[in-house]
């Protein structure tokens, strides 16, 4: 019940003692009353306490070496990229944790968002996920190819923020300290260096739209997603402390680097380096190369940290299969152990799995599907075969030339 009178009896707020005549509205409960001013004050107190809890979580920011140790437990290789990410993430959250206590005369620390460049399956998304998990902050993934600028059919960039808010269980204060990973950022590059007269819906316009939220702004987000509508209730979120990590394969950027370095890449026999040596070119990438690829200067300027990831080779993929805490081989061994069965992979089988992933150009992300293909029939039959004690995966089984070897009691 809400109003200024209850049975024509003058009522007072149970919290501040003001009468119905001194406030705009009094809400009645079970023998208790609260005025609109106390409701507003309560909301402000709750908001401040939630913000303090979020900041308290960030006061002990893991040091770069500690972050690197975590990444090393889950991610194989990519040492330079992991070091760059560890430093960038530490500096970002150190900046966030000290922002609230800084004096007006202190140096204004600008946000350093991150650009990850590397081939498909090199671990870009997994690195971002692992960092967010280790910091216990909300994390959201978005695909740049699904975004369009305002006025076109597609997804508004604000919907990226909604995913983060949802990951934070609609706690906006927590979301404002989260991490957003935008994948396939190279797919919204301008087509060529010459700016078209008509805007490219999936290119420069989307970069401009992303630029606003990446550099820091108070954005209005539709709580149910989709396009904005007049008179629609919005969630307000400040993006100044959200860490944005964007990533893409940037296929062909090695050639841009070679041209800048003065190497001939056109004509038969002119490229003296092997394709495998492209990894060294990835470490030479500068903003000029990224701009030539098609990202606008303003957008590049908001991504000062560039982490280049290498193409994974057979040795790297075998290590990914076996070494990390959550390695795929360990996962499948655990699955079969629940049925009382031991699982073993021959060394040649691991090499065959890695070779298949390279041939398919899927990198680490393709390893699971190859194992699934190899073990599908086994995982179907094993629960019904109580006499089986061990399964051995061979090279021939991976190549589809024979079935895995079964040992019985």
Swiss-Prot record:
Task: Read off the Gene3D superfamilies from this record.
Answer: 1.10.8.60, ClpX chaperone, C4-type zinc finger domain (6.20.220.10), P-loop containing nucleotide triphosphate hydrolases (3.40.50.300)
Q: Which residues form the ClpX-type ZB domain?
A: 1-54
At the top level, the lineage of the source is Bacteria
Residues at which ATP binds = 119-126
Check the record and name the PROSITE patterns matching this protein. CLPX_ZB
Query: One Pfam family name from the record?
Result: zf-C4_ClpX
Name the InterPro entries on file: AAA+_ATPase, ATP-dep_Clp_protease_ClpX, ATPase_AAA_core, Clp_ATPase_C, Clp_protease_ATP-bd_su_ClpX, ClpX_bact, P-loop_NTPase, Znf_CppX_C4
What are the alphabetically sorted keywords of the record?
ATP-binding, Chaperone, Metal-binding, Nucleotide-binding, Zinc
Cysteine pairs forming cystine bridges in this chain are none
Assembly and oligomerization? Component of the ClpX-ClpP complex. Forms a hexameric ring that, in the presence of ATP, binds to fourteen ClpP subunits assembled into a disk-like structure with a central cavity, resembling the structure of eukaryotic proteasomes.
Q: What is this protein called?
A: ATP-dependent Clp protease ATP-binding subunit ClpX
């Amino acid at each position: 019940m809400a109003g200024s009178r209850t049975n024509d009896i003058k009522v007072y707020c149970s919290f501040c003692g003001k009468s119905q005549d001194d406030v705009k509205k009094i809400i009645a409960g079970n023998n208790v009353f609260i005025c609109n001013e106390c409701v507003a004050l309560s909301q402000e107190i709750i908001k401040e306490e939630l913000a303090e809890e979020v900041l308290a979580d960030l006061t002990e920011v893991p040091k770069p070496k500690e972050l690197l140790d975590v990444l090393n437990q889950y991610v194989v290789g990519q040492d330079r990229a992991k070091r760059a990410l560890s430093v960038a993430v530490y500096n970002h959250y150190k900046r966030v944790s000290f922002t609230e206590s800084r004096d007006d005369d202190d140096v204004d620390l600008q946000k350093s968002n991150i650009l990850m460049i590397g081939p498909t399956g090199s671990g870009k998304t997994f690195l971002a996920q692992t960092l967010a998990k280790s910091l216990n902050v909300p994390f959201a993934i978005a695909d740049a190819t699904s975004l369009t600028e305002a006025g076109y059919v597609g997804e508004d960039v604000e919907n990226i923020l909604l995913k983060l808010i949802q990951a934070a269980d609609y706690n906006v204060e927590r979301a404002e300290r989260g991490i957003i990973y935008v994948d396939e950022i190279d797919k919204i590059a301008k087509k060529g260096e010459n700016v078209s007269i008509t805007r490219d819906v999936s290119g420069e316009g989307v970069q401009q739209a992303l630029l606003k939220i990446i550099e820091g702004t108070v954005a209005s987000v539709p709580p149910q997603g989709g396009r904005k509508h007049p008179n629609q209730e919005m969630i307000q979120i400040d993006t100044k402390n959200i860490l944005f990590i964007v990533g893409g394969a940037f296929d062909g950027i090695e050639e841009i680097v070679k041209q800048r370095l003065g190497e001939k890449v056109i004509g038969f026999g002119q490229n003296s380096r092997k394709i495998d040596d492209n990894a060294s070119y990835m470490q030479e990438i500068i903003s000029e190369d990224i701009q030539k690829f098609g990202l606008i200067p303003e957008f590049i300027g908001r991504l000062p940290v560039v982490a280049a990831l290498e193409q994974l080779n057979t040795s790297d993929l075998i290590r990914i299969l076996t070494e990390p805490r959550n390695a795929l081989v360990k996962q499948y061994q655990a699955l079969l152990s629940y049925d009382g069965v031991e699982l073993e992979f021959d060394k040649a089988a691991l090499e065959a799995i890695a070779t298949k992933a390279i041939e398919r150009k899927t990198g680490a992300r393709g390893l699971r599907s190859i194992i699934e293909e190899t073990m599908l029939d086994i995982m179907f039959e094993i629960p019904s075969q109580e006499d089986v004690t061990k399964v051995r995966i061979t090279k021939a089984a991976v190549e589809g030339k024979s079935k895995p070897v079964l040992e019985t009691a």
